[in-house]
Amino acid sequence: MKHNQNIDFVSIVIPVYNEEASLPELLSRTLAAADSMGKHYELVLIDDGSRDNSANIIEAAAAEPDSHVVGIILNRNYGQHNAIMAGFEHVRGDLIITLDADLQNPPEEIPNLVAKAEEGYDSVGTVRRHRQDSALRRYPSKLINKLVKRSTGVEMNDYGCMLRAYRRHVVKAMLECHERSTFIPILANGFARHTAEIDVHHSERSQGESKYGFMNLINLMFDLLTSMTTAPLRMLSIVGGGIASFGILFGLFLILLRLIYGAEWGVDGVFPLFSILFIFIGAQFVGLGLLGEYIGRIYSDVRARPRYYVQDILVGEATKGARISDENKNN
């Protein structure tokens, strides 16, 4: 049975990092798309420690008469997912939508997510149709999608697309999780009973630079695998067992060749042995790296430092009273 609670209020959460070039267009297009829904809404913009003029643009937008914009200013850069979690702490909506600030995913798709959620889904994901990224972005992303899907067991076709919709109870459940490393789409699907995906348009980035280069994608893959599953550790044990078995068989094979061809064969085979030895040493370092990732995350969790620090919350006078009233009801 699907969740059929009405959606009367929509919160749109957008993390912002050095996006002053695209912010004016983002604001106008997102507000226009939200107006077209015919529902109450708010636009929550989180400045994730930007070094440009992004925070000032957000402040000006929140200060406009009858503004729907809420600005959350973090004291430094904490990363995309932590910034979104900071936004989740201050939303009021029945449905919460996340969106990147680069305009590659059009804000005009927001009403489509709301319509799909109103069919009774707790979480609505998106799949980018005809991606406009370079091959260096597309192919690593496809590889990461396949690896993460196999490792986590979560059925999602496009982990990198942050244009998504979540019911309020899913967001509330995520806020009760306190791990330092969080990947929101996978975490949300763990609390959503009914999930769906829709196709969305994808555009080229017209202004600014992508915050995810090739190495960032590799780091993201490690974050995904080590923060959501212990499958890499199990795989490491399997690979280690396979290497050990191969080593034993290869040793027996060398003994057999030595018996057949004599002691001189062993001298001639020194360099192949060194090559194989380096392969084994490399495998050990990979394993140590994975173990280090997990130990490092345990260390971060034990320190229990906050995932982010909100320096300021910018709310216009028109919406301040409504937010105070809602907070009093929730308390």
Curated annotation (Swiss-Prot):
Q: Where are the transmembrane segments?
A: 236-256, 270-290
Would I find Transit peptide among this entry's keywords?
no
Chief place where the protein resides: membrane
Pathway recorded for this protein = Glycolipid biosynthesis; 4-amino-4-deoxy-alpha-L-arabinose undecaprenyl phosphate biosynthesis; 4-amino-4-deoxy-alpha-L-arabinose undecaprenyl phosphate from UDP-4-deoxy-4-formamido-beta-L-arabinose and undecaprenyl phosphate: step 1/2; Bacterial outer membrane biogenesis; lipopolysaccharide biosynthesis
Looking up NCBIfam families in the UniProt record yields: PRK10714.1
State where the protein is found: Cell inner membrane
Listed A to Z, the keywords are: Antibiotic resistance, Cell inner membrane, Cell membrane, Glycosyltransferase, Lipid A biosynthesis, Lipid biosynthesis, Lipid metabolism, Lipopolysaccharide biosynthesis, Membrane, Transferase, Transmembrane, Transmembrane helix
Q: Name one GO molecular function term.
A: undecaprenyl-phosphate 4-deoxy-4-formamido-L-arabinose transferase activity
User: Keyword Lipid biosynthesis: yes or no?
Assistant: yes
What are the BP-aspect GO terms? 4-amino-4-deoxy-alpha-L-arabinopyranosyl undecaprenyl phosphate biosynthetic process; lipid A biosynthetic process; lipopolysaccharide biosynthetic process; response to antibiotic
Query: How does the record classify its membrane topology?
Result: Multi-pass membrane protein
Q: Name one GO cellular component term.
A: plasma membrane
Q: Which domain of life is it from?
A: Bacteria
Q: What is this protein called?
A: Undecaprenyl-phosphate 4-deoxy-4-formamido-L-arabinose transferase
The reaction(s) annotated as catalysed by this protein in its Swiss-Prot or TrEMBL entry are: UDP-4-deoxy-4-formamido-beta-L-arabinose + di-trans,octa-cis-undecaprenyl phosphate = 4-deoxy-4-formamido-alpha-L-arabinopyranosyl di-trans,octa-cis-undecaprenyl phosphate + UDP
EC number(s) per UniProt? 2.4.2.53
Cited function: Catalyzes the transfer of 4-deoxy-4-formamido-L-arabinose from UDP to undecaprenyl phosphate. The modified arabinose is attached to lipid A and is required for resistance to polymyxin and cationic antimicrobial peptides.
Belongs to which family?
Answer: Belongs to the glycosyltransferase 2 family.
